[in-house]
Amino acid sequence: AVIGDAALLKAQGVPIVEVMAVSEAQARFATALPVIHHPLPTPVESGRPDPLNAPAVADGIELAVSLAVSGEASGVVTAPIAKAPMYASGFRFPGHTEFIAELTADAPYAGTRGPVMMLTARDLRACLVTIHVALDQAPQLVTAERIARTARVVHESLKRDFQIASPRLAMAALNPHAGEGGALGLQELEILIPTAARLRAEGVDISDPRPADTLFHEEARRTYDAAICMYHDQALIPVKTLDFW
């Protein structure tokens, strides 16, 4: 079911039917989009997000997550949010990923906690070490701890959620040519390579940093089950190039 303003969706010409619970949704999909009505306080003009509606948008995300945590829903599919009006309203999270992590922080979970953003396209799974940060901030945030946590979460998820018995991870380098032996940056020598070695000692099958410009072509993708990427566009450019909607 969609959690949203039923009147707004209906005005867009979308055939909808209001439902009171997620359990009612499956029987309705054949004829209309099932909607759990979650009204917005201010009229919406397409293409002009209003900060006055931002708290209701955040509340809708929180409601969806609560339904998943309680078991009423099997999962949550998020739609894009306009971040600038969200921030203007006082929303303090960089994006969905971090907000959902906060909402689920107290939920029972035995594995390594993220959050980790994984995006998939065809045979590619790309996972981010840094997420919604400016590019000039990303290198400072590419730490051994963040890389290791991301790799552990992905390793566990591939086994649990994708039934891959022995996951293979490819680490994308931060710098061009994987740093060229230190000539184009020291992060590979000082952070990425030692972290990969420690992870392998733990039983995580992860490569040393590989140049990102040759990591995502078809033949390369056959050599790993997920790529551990250092920053946002390093992961999202190949994903959206392969399968853009």
Regions found by a protein language model. Give the residues of each.
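A generic local secondary-structure boundary/capping motif
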Residues: 24, 105-107, 115-119, 159-161
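Contiguous, glycine/small-aliphatic-enriched amphipathic segments in soluble metabolic enzymes
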Residues: 1-98, 141, 145, 149-230, ...
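A generic secondary-structure signal marking the coil-to-beta-strand transition
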Residues: 31-34, 114, 125
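Glycine/threonine-rich beta-strand-loop-alpha-helix active-site module
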Residues: 87-116
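Ligand-binding beta-strand-loop-alpha-helix segment within the catalytic cores
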Residues: 117-141, 145-149
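Alpha-helix boundary/capping residues
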Residues: 15-16, 107, 133
